[in-house]
Each structure stands twice: as structure tokens, then as C-alpha cells.
UniProtKB/Swiss-Prot annotation:
The protein's name: Uncharacterized PKHD-type hydroxylase sll0191
Assigned keywords, A-Z: Dioxygenase, Iron, Metal-binding, Oxidoreductase, Vitamin C
Cofactor note (record): Binds 1 Fe(2+) ion per subunit.
E.C. code: 1.14.11.-
Amino acid sequence: MNRGAKVKTNGDNLALSTRAKKLLTKSIDTLETIIDNDQCSPQEKATIALKILEMAGIFTEFKHHSVDKLVAKAEEKIRRLQSQYPQINLSLSEPTLHQQSESIFLPGTYGEIKNFLSPEENQKIITEAIDKKEEYIKSNTTTKANQYRQSYVLFSQKIPALSALIRERIKQKLPELLGQLNFSPFEVAEIELQLTAHNDGCYYRIHNDAGSEKTASRQITYVYYFYQEPKAFSGGELRLYDTELKNNTITTHPKFQTITPINNSIIFFNSRCRHEVMSVVCPSREFAHSRFTVNGWIRKKMN
């Protein structure tokens, strides 16, 4: 009986191993498809490439015959990314998580600059945002959560001149903004940027912008508002919540600030603060009548 049971267990293990191989192969193929998509940001591609290597490492436990080829292919993707985007530091080591024993309270405060651009620059951005309607893609989140966010995004690579203008103005204003937000001066590694359109029914549920290893270096979130006047939508307010951080957990307090979109204004706030975009009501549903933003994150250079 014991011998029969042993044979059955080995068979079960073999079946499990085969299923695991198939599942891992399918998962890696899916990741490779995503990494070849030009709509992914460089940081997302880097994360996916590292995930492929991680899965390839798991694959070696099964002594799969094509592991060497798989790893070489994944490493080649990383080398290609590194040469294409030298500003991204790709590390193959495991991230170190630091426990946070003390509670940190972040009030939902923000800095605001009205008339951030000249009227001519503002109008030029509105025109470009509308003209590139066909180039937007549906937004998602870093966690790929369903029904958590609805909007349309245009990445910075599609709008190089606009991106350069916004980044330069932010750099000029950053010293005074750090004081307003109670930040100590820090070396900026990158200013991430994207253009987002919210039309009828669009929203973004409560979240923060620096809640993962991938986003940990984000310090300040910014949102530049612009739209056609007279305004053809309502809603779309930003709620900025008092937030508490302790032991790698985030608590959203009930108190919040409400920020109403104002054309040609920009706001800045701590990326760790929880916030949400309320639903937009746009009766015409015309894309040109959307609530537009240039939004992004100021990253700190990490040692």
C-alpha cells in the first residue's frame, strides 16, 4: 500500500510540475507581449522586464530545457531598455523594505499657482490636447485594478514640446513650493508627466501616488488644469485627504480639502497623501469639452 501511495504522489507531483511549467510559460509570454507595447512607460517596462527575470528564476527549479534561452532573452530586453532609457537605474537585487515604526501624519494641504502659463501657451496646450484625440489610450493603475479609474491618457513621448515647457516651469517654481509643502530641498531625479482627459462619467477612486516600491521615490504630485472656456463640464474636483502612515500601512482620515479645477492653474501636494478625482459630468460628451490636466510626479534621486 505504501509503495502504491508513493507512485501516486510522484504522479501528482509530475502533473503539478507540468501545469506549473505551462502556467509560467503563459505568464512570461503575456509579460513579453506587454513589454513590447509602446504605450507602456519606461518605468513600467523596466518593472515588467525584472518580473520576467524573476519568473525565469522560478522556472529553473523545474529544470526546464529552455531556461538559458529564456533568461538571455529577458536580459537582452533589459539591456535594450537601459541603452534606450539611461535615466532608469535597473537593479536585479531584491528591494529592501524598511519598517516604519513611528506614525507620520500628512495633512491634505497643497500649493497652488494661478495663471501658471501665459494665455497664449495655455491656448496652445488646449488646441494640442484636442487635436491629438486619436492618440489617447484608456488609463489604468499600477495595480491594474478594475473599475478604479476611468479617463484617457497621452504619454509625454507624444507631446515633447508641451512636456519640456511644463517641466521647465515646474523647475523654476520648485524652490518656493518646497517651503509651502514643508519639504526639505532634494535633488530631482525625474519629473514624470502625462496628459489626462476626463469626460462624462470619468473618475479616479481614492489612492496615493507613492505606495509601492516602483513609485517610492515620488515626492510631489502636480496637476495643471486646462479646458475650453466657457467650461462645458461640472464635477471633477480633487479631494485631498489627511493621511497617516505607520508600519507600511496608510490610513485615510475623513477630513479633506476640495480643489475645484481652474483653467491655467497648477496645484502641488505630497505624493503620499491619499486623494481622488470626483466624477465628471459633461452633458455634450464632446471630447473637446473634457476636463484636461497635465499631471505627474517629481521624483527624488535616491542614494
